[in-house]
């Protein structure tokens, strides 16, 4: 398949790059790339993949656009809030490059559909942020022989790697045979993220996809070496460090044929990724250990402990509340109040406050309750002028 006159004009500036050239462009045109997740990573990656001229670009995302996404998910706009993210992204991408076929898959990726979707593509970009989905993407891609470009970003840092390169490189399970404890996994809704940081990682993912598909890593003068790139946006200077990673694990349960335990049949019929990866159980209190925001509002001067991180507390908080971040509270064996004090505990959503109450009871503070729904519910039911972030 050759290029049209329009394509020569559109892609001319990258055609003359020595490392890329005409054959690189033709390879992109003949390739089908799937981006799982049209969020902070997926949006910039999609823009550059479509701009570069991949023949077919697929988008998997069942979520809808929220106004809190817009500072970093730059394909979406105020006008597309509440629209499916994959459809919102397609609207903008079609304007950017009408020569690219854009397919949308408005579903939650699952063992029931991952193989059917992935079989339509040649390379996968993992732009998700949950361990369960990362393992599913990895396992499906490995069993189909697909390369995965994997990225992530949180707060001011990001990382990037290429998995199962050319069906010979190490996979996600080679590096992480077992999932991390649920308590150690922080989503950007909890830990925060700066838009440019996640944007840089998404752009880097697109570049690696271009390099893989155009054949750069298969050149005689280039030897692919598994790597992990770590980006830091803060400090005196921005930094990007790249580390060589080990090759395939001889004990891997999916990419090593000799030790393979995970097959397509196992994934589609037996393996529950959400259960295997675990999930934080926040429903740890009895009904009488919880109160509504209306009940809290009825108290004249409650002893109110806000267990959010200090950065969040400084954004907005209820008057007369005391800030003791959950991580600090877990290491405390006493408070500056008598054990019989009635203590109300609040957080952002009503999850961490339950864990805090459980700890307080374990150190002797029996008269403590958490506030259901946290400050978010307070804004909805009590004070609509209280900011939600």
From Swiss-Prot:
One of its GO terms (molecular function) is adenylyltransferase activity. One of its GO terms (cellular component) is cytosol. It is an enzyme of class 2 (transferase). It comes from Ogataea parapolymorpha (strain ATCC 26012 / BCRC 20466 / JCM 22074 / NRRL Y-7560 / DL-1) (Yeast). This is Adenylyltransferase and sulfurtransferase uba4. Zn(2+) binds at residues 171, 174, 252, 255. Residues 298-387 form the Rhodanese domain. Coiled coil: none annotated. ATP binds at residues 40, 61, 68-72, 85, 129-130.
């Amino acid at each position: 398949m050759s290029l049209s006159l329009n394509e020569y004009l559109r892609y001319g500036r990258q055609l003359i790059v020595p490392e890329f050239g005409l054959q690189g462009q033709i390879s992109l045109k003949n390739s089908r790339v799937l981006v799982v997740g049209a969020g902070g990573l997926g949006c910039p990656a999609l823009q550059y993949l479509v701009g570069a001229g991949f023949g077919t670009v697929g988008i998997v995302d069942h979520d809808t656009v929220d106004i809190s996404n817009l500072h970093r998910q730059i394909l979406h706009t105020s006008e597309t809030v509440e629209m499916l993210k994959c459809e919102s992204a397609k609207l903008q991408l079609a304007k950017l490059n009408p020569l690219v076929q854009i397919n949308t898959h408005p579903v939650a990726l699952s063992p029931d559909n991952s193989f059917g979707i992935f079989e339509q593509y040649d390379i996968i970009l993992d732009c998700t942020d949950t361990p369960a989905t990362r393992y599913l993407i990895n396992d499906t891609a490995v069993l189909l022989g697909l390369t995965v470009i994997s990225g992530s970003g949180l707060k001011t840092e990001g990382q990037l790697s290429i998995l199962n390169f050319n069906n010979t490189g190490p996979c996600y399970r080679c590096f992480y045979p077992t999932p991390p404890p649920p308590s150690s996994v922080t989503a950007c809704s909890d830990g925060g993220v700066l838009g440019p940081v996640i944007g840089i990682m998404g752009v880097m993912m697109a570049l690696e996809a271009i390099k893989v598909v155009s054949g750069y890593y298969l050149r005689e003068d280039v030897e692919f070496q598994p790597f992990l790139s770590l980006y830091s946006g803060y400090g005196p200077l921005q930094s990007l460090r790249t580390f060589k990673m080990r090759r395939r694990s001889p004990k891997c349960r999916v990419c090593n044929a000799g030790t393979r335990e995970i097959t397509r049949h196992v994934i589609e019929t037996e393996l529950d990724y959400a259960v295997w990866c675990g999930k934080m159980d926040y429903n740890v209190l009895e009904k009488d250990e919880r109160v509504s925001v209306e009940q809290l509002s009825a108290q004249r001067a409650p002893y109110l402990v806000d267990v959010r991180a200090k950065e969040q507390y400084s954004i907005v908080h209820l008057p007369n509340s005391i800030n003791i971040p959950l991580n600090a509270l877990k290491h405390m064996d006493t408070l500056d109040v008598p054990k019989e004090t009635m203590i109300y505990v609040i957080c952002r959503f009503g999850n961490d406050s339950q864990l805090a109450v459980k700890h307080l009871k374990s150190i002797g503070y029996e008269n403590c309750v958490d506030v259901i729904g946290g400050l978010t519910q307070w804004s909805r039911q009590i004070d609509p002028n209280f900011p939600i972030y």
